[in-house]
Amino acid sequence: MSKLGQEKNEVNYSDVREDRVVTNSTGNPINEPFVTQRIGEHGPLLLQDYNLIDSLAHFNRENIPQRNPHAHGSGAFGYFEVTDDITDICGSAMFSKIGKRTKCLTRFSTVGGDKGSADTVRDPRGFATKFYTEEGNLDWVYNNTPVFFIRDPSKFPHFIHTQKRNPQTNLRDADMFWDFLTTPENQVAIHQVMILFSDRGTPANYRSMHGYSGHTYKWSNKNGDWHYVQVHIKTDQGIKNLTIEEATKIAGSNPDYCQQDLFEAIQNGNYPSWTVYIQTMTERDAKKLPFSVFDLTKVWPQGQFPLRRVGKIVLNENPLNFFAQVEQAAFAPSTTVPYQEASADPVLQARLFSYADAHRYRLGPNFHQIPVNCPYASKFFNPAIRDGPMNVNGNFGSEPTYLANDKSYTYIQQDRPIQQHQEVWNGPAIPYHWATSPGDVDFVQARNLYRVLGKQPGQQKNLAYNIGIHVEGACPQIQQRVYDMFARVDKGLSEAIKKVAEAKHASELSSNSKF
């Protein structure tokens, strides 16, 4: 078993020879790796040449399915350190005292791109962190934007498909992209779309961007008191973004620019760090909001729900093997610890299943046995979870395949009092999704964002330009829907987008006429 995640980042598998004698996969020493058995010097090969077959057969199977989405990513190890007491909010052991450190792994990623795509393209960024706590592993599976495109989980596969390739041309498709987003019931995405097409949609590197839970979570203290919580992870390096021209140029010259930047910064001792904050809200406060506390397309006003500092994340160790420690890392919102729970946010509820299930497909049902995913700080014991492909942890030996009453098992009881009525839900089982036509409340925060961009030189202009350049690739009918949607934010913005799109179209016509 690997010692990954302990005092030193090591890959030290027991089946790897320390004397570095080269063998085939069964441990048989190889005299010469590049010879093949054949009849004479120029005759056909022999099927009995197992070393050749062993090598080729493994080569055919060495790739695993890529993530869908978040395929292109980078990662590093580090630690989380508590700087402020929040035990009145959360009873998790990782927050138990100031100065306490917890080992962690963070993976950054783009969302829509393939594994080999550029990491400077316009796209949200994933910001996932696995904490190896003494109460089990905890995954914060976040993004670099505080909101998202949808609030109905059933739309997630459809939305992700629009961010990928046309099934006929295998090309990115502006019609698909904007057709989905401008459908009336999907225009709740407007806030996220504006963040995406501002310069914040092209971060300069992974070190210089924030992370957000987006979702509302439910945290409890050891007295049983609970709050709704959102988490903000603020970069200590300062926000740095690229313009569309800079991002496009870098994508063409170095598609792994952000990955290289992260690796080299850590390698050179320039360890990136982020300060972790939380926003908290009582159930009573939630009922007073003009929107649902479970609406993933909305932010909580910081004037009303101020940020409260918690601690710091520092990344100071590069992976020793990318495949073993980053590609095989499995993050899921369902991976949680005592006192940190999911809320009734419907998209979060759906992610509780879908993320872990994606890892079962991508890595196999025993993905938790892969060293990078092992809860090494708390260990694992449940003899009913056993067998299956690639079970390599001893399979609990002679333990019964069920939890037997006559065995001396230990069950840990949480310290907090059991509250029977923390949340009360009462109603019929119904088919439901949010309002089919977004109301004015769904555009308020987008308008506020546009005003904020107006205080930053050139940012409103860049937003209009970035949208106009992209929407020009869509058909005229969809273009008009885009203009109409942004007119609900600001008529001047809508007109500026249209002007950019028309200018780009005219320029392309002029260029084509020269040939």
Swiss-Prot record:
Query: What domain of life is recorded for the organism?
Result: Eukaryota
Indicate the residues that form the catalytic site. Answer: 70, 143
Which terms does the record give in the GO molecular function aspect? catalase activity; heme binding; metal ion binding
* Documented EC number(s): 1.11.1.6
Residue span of motif Microbody targeting signal: 513-515
Q: Which Pfam families match?
A: Catalase, Catalase-rel
Say if the entry is tagged with keyword Heme: yes
Any single GO CC term annotated in Swiss-Prot or TrEMBL for this entry: mitochondrion
Enzyme class, one word? oxidoreductase
Location comes to:
Peroxisome matrix
Instruction: Indicate where this protein is primarily found.
Output: other
Q: Which residues form the signal peptide?
A: none
Q: Which cofactor does it need?
A: heme
Q: Which UniProt keywords apply?
A: Acetylation, Heme, Hydrogen peroxide, Iron, Metal-binding, Oxidoreductase, Peroxidase, Peroxisome
Q: Give me the reactions it catalyses.
A: 2 H2O2 = O2 + 2 H2O
- Write down which residues bear the modification named N-acetylserine: 2
List all disulphide bridges recorded for this chain: none
Binding of heme occurs at 355
**Cited InterPro entries:** Catalase (IPR018028), Catalase_AS (IPR024708), Catalase_clade1/3 (IPR024711), Catalase_core (IPR011614), Catalase_haem_BS (IPR002226), Catalase_immune_responsive (IPR010582), Catalase_sf (IPR020835)
Query: Which terms under GO biological process does the entry name?
Result: hydrogen peroxide catabolic process; response to hydrogen peroxide; response to reactive oxygen species
Q: What else is known?
A: This is one of two catalases in S.cerevisiae; the other is catalase T, which is the cytoplasmic form. Present with 623 molecules/cell in log phase SD medium.
Protein family membership: Belongs to the catalase family.
Q: What does this protein do?
A: Catalyzes the degradation of hydrogen peroxide (H(2)O(2)) generated by peroxisomal oxidases to water and oxygen, thereby protecting cells from the toxic effects of hydrogen peroxide.
Q: Assembly state and interactors? A: Homotetramer.
This protein is called what?
Answer: Peroxisomal catalase A
Supply the source organism for this entry: Saccharomyces cerevisiae (strain ATCC 204508 / S288c) (Baker's yeast)
